[in-house]
UniProtKB/Swiss-Prot annotation:
Keywords: Cell outer membrane, Lipoprotein, Membrane, Palmitate, Signal. A lipid is attached at residue 24 (S-diacylglycerol cysteine). This is Outer membrane protein assembly factor BamB. It is found in: Cell outer membrane. Residues 1-23 form the signal peptide. HAMAP family: OM_assembly_BamB. Belongs to the BamB family. InterPro entries: BamB, PQQ_b-propeller_rpt, PQQ_rpt_dom, Quinoprotein_ADH-like_sf, WD40/YVTN_repeat-like_dom_sf. One of its GO terms (biological process) is Gram-negative-bacterium-type cell outer membrane assembly. Gene3D superfamilies: YVTN repeat-like/Quinoprotein amine dehydrogenase (2.130.10.10). Part of the outer membrane protein assembly complex, which is involved in assembly and insertion of beta-barrel proteins into the outer membrane. The keyword Plastid does not apply. GO terms for cellular component: cell outer membrane.
Length: 406
């Protein structure tokens, strides 16, 4: 009888162990399912199918050298007088015909010497173009001015830190923002430094600097502390400073509020965005805010005659009323695709993404209108539209031109 009882105990114990293991398996599967769902929710949105409402033609594509890769400087070309001026990290500077992409001239920088060794100069900031000059900055803090007509070197200057934003040229001055927050002004004819203005930066900031924007007698500078500053063009005197994104939060990461996208000066009104998902419209002469909205991101805004379009850090694109900032529409189909700043081409807003795709959205309602791919490499730089042609540069150093079909 005792043996029979022991046998029943063993059977019961085995049954309990089996139930316990089955329960563990069920709980584990439940958590695994939640983890998979959470992971999928963080993945870039898959591209949705839609019926294009506009046709986009690819005009040309060309490489200008080895691109920025993961350096994160968001290089893009500049355009003047029917020519595209472009640079790559180790590829020099090229002038291309805007309509055909054919090379007009090419500049190869001399190798720099350090500790009795020669290294290729890495061209990172710009180029900027104006007043007969093409100006580029380097990761070593060199500023190189070229003749716009033939690419010959005219002068060199030095700044104390790497240059990762395009220089600006205005009223016989070359204006350079270095990564330490300093703005330096050089004589456009000689390269002699005229003035500089230093801005204190935060402990932690987003990689990238906003290009300098100039107005009549004024220099507008986006800062890593989340402000936009106005300086007097001729001597660098501070005129005003306005917060775009307030650096709030418990950690340095939460407080990041950089203004890294190119501000847009439209008439006398400035439009700027910050990493804090803020967009602000303000008076250029006084810095007085006109409106602010909790939609925006690290990339620059696109401004049309009636709509300000911004892409936020989550990958949603917003259309804001130009006069009031009220949200007119939003488009979430590109969520988490690491969108660029916004360009305006005709009746469409255009953004690029991490897979090299460009997306055209209707300005009227934000609906997807067209899609094209500018190669397989990441697009970080804000697209540029000149004379109806959209230009975009990817991280591999390729530039591609698109036009809306007539």
């Amino acid at each position: 009888m005792m043996k029979q009882v022991d046998m029943y105990k063993r059977v019961a114990l085995i049954a309990l162990m089996g139930m316990s293991l089955a329960g563990c398996s069920t709980v584990k599967g439940w958590f695994a399912g939640k983890d998979a769902a959470a992971k999928k929710a963080q993945e870039p949105a898959e591209l949705v199918k839609f019926e294009p409402s506009v046709k986009v033609d690819k005009l040309w594509s060309t490489g200008v050298g080895k691109g920025e890769g993961h350096i994160g400087v968001r290089q893009r070309p500049a355009v003047a007088d029917g020519k595209v001026y472009a640079a790559a990290i180790t590829g020099g500077v090229q002038a291309l015909d805007l309509q055909t992409g054919k090379r007009v001239w090419e500049y190869k920088p001399k190798k720099e010497e350090r500790n009795d060794r020669k290294f290729k100069q890495r061209l990172s900031g710009g180029p900027g173009v104006g007043e007969g000059l093409v100006v580029i900055g380097t990761l070593s803090g060199d500023v190189i001015a070229l003749n716009q007509a033939d690419g010959t070197e005219k002068w060199r200057a030095k700044v104390p830190n790497e240059v990762i934003a395009a220089p600006a040229i205005a009223q016989s001055l070359v204006l350079v923002r270095s990564n330490d927050g300093r703005v330096s002004a050089f004589d456009a004819a000689t390269g002699e430094r005229r003035w500089f203005h230093a801005e204190e930066g935060p402990t932690l900031s987003v990689r990238g600097n906003a290009p300098i924007v100039t107005g009549p007698g004024v220099v507008f500078v986006g800062n890593d502390v989340g402000t936009l500053s106005a300086l007097a063009l001729q001597d660098g005197r501070p005129l005003w400073e306005q917060a775009i994104g307030v650096p709030e939060g418990r950690t340095e990461l939460e407080r990041m509020s950089d203004v890294d996208g190119a501000p847009v000066l439209d008439g006398t009104t400035l439009y700027a965005t910050s990493f804090k998902n803020e967009t602000l419209a303000l008076e250029g002469p006084s810095g007085r805010p006109l409106w602010t909205r909790d939609h925006g991101g690290a990339g620059g805004p696109g401004v049309s005659s009636s709509v300000v379009v911004v892409a936020d850090n989550a990958g949603s694109v917003w259309g804001l009323d130009k006069s009031s900032g009220a949200a007119m529409w939003s488009q979430a189909a590109l969520a988490r695709r690491s969108l660029t700043g916004v360009a305006i081409q005709g009746d469409y807003a255009v953004v690029g993404d991490y897979k090299g795709y460009l997306h055209w959205l209707k300005l009227s309602d934000g609906a997807l209108a067209a899609r094209a791919r500018a190669g397989r490499d990441t697009l970080l730089a804000q697209p540029l539209v000149v004379d109806g042609i959209l230009l975009v540069q990817n991280t591999d150093g390729d530039i591609t031109a698109f036009r809306l079909a007539q």
